[in-house]
């Protein structure tokens, strides 16, 4: 069977003993995990049920860094959800790794204050990347086959408000 060591190599294993108390395996971890997707995802918090699916799929796709942010359209109660607790996050990240046959756990940063995050942290985060913000009214086409690291900001259900789009563009983002 396929096996992997969290944040380590992947390989194969064979069960050698199984009983009521334990399972023993011979394991060989001889391959590097898949290359990470060169994407930092900045994601406005969504309903917890949707968040569970999104974080699992991001992990399965090979994204290695997600930053959860607040937005005017995000309900305050979402930030109190148990899904944001460390153990709960780990559960959904591991499910994604299993689906993606990967072992490198993505980093989840939680930034519940929009303006301080955009002004104080975001300029350093986007250095060396192409920063895009998903915006339904953007005139710019979303590029493909970019071939370099990128940062993508995705708004909440209902989208970022004009002030938030303005702040992201001032920081260096292109609306697509």
Named regions from a protein language model:
Residues 1-31:
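N-terminal positively charged helical leader segments and presequences
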Residues 33-132:
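RNA substrate-binding interface of SAM-dependent RNA methyltransferases
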Residues 57-61, 148, 167-170:
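Short, solvent-exposed amphipathic alpha-helical segments in soluble enzyme
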Residues 130-136, 155:
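Short, hydrophobic beta-strand segments that form beta-sheet elements in well-ordered domains
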Residues 135-146:
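Strongly charged, low-complexity linkers/loops
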Residues 147-166:
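A C-terminal functional module that forms or caps the active site or interfaces directly
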Residues 162-176:
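Structured adenosyl-cofactor binding patch, chiefly the S-adenosyl-L-methionine
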């Amino acid at each position: 069977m396929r096996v992997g060591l969290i944040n380590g190599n992947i390989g194969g294993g064979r069960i050698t003993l199984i009983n009521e108390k334990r399972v023993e395996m011979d394991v060989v971890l001889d391959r590097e995990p898949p290359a990470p997707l060169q994407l930092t995802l900045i994601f406005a918090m969504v309903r917890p049920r949707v968040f569970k699916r999104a974080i699992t799929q991001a992990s399965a796709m090979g994204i290695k860094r997600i930053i959860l942010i607040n937005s005017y359209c995000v309900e305050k109660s979402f930030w109190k959800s148990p899904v944001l607790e460390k153990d709960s996050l780990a559960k959904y990240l591991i499910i994604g790794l299993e689906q993606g046959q990967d072992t490198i756990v993505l980093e989840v940063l939680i930034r519940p204050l929009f303006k301080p995050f955009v002004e104080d942290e975001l300029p350093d985060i986007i250095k060396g990347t192409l920063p895009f913000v998903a915006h339904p009214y953007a005139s710019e086409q979303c590029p493909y086959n970019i071939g370099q690291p990128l940062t993508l900001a995705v708004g909440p259900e209902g989208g970022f408000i004009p002030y938030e789009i303005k702040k992201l563009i001032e920081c260096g983002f292109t609306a697509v």
